[in-house]
């Protein structure tokens, strides 16, 4: 598994727990390089995995 895929999987796990801001996700993933975080975020967006709740926080879309 690539670093990007691993970080994307961690993002998905965090968003399963509860909706978060992008900033909160970045703080939770502090051990990952910011560039890898952005690439992982982009991969989730391209896959249309991200949605927002009524407060504007990011969450996983229901599939």
Task: Please annotate each region the language model reported.
Residues 32-43:
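Short amphipathic alpha-helical interaction segments
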Residues 26, 40, 55-56:
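Short loop/turn and capping residues at structural boundaries
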Residues 23, 34, 52-53:
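A local structural micro-motif
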Residues 17-29:
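Short acidic, hydrophobic short linear motifs in intrinsically disordered regions
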Residues 2-18, 39-40:
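Positively charged, polyanion-binding regions of nucleic-acid-associated proteins
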Residues 1-7, 52-63:
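Short, cationic-aromatic polyanion-contact patches
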Residues 48:
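Glycine-centered, phosphate/nucleic-acid-interacting loop/turn motifs that mediate DNA/RNA or nucleotide
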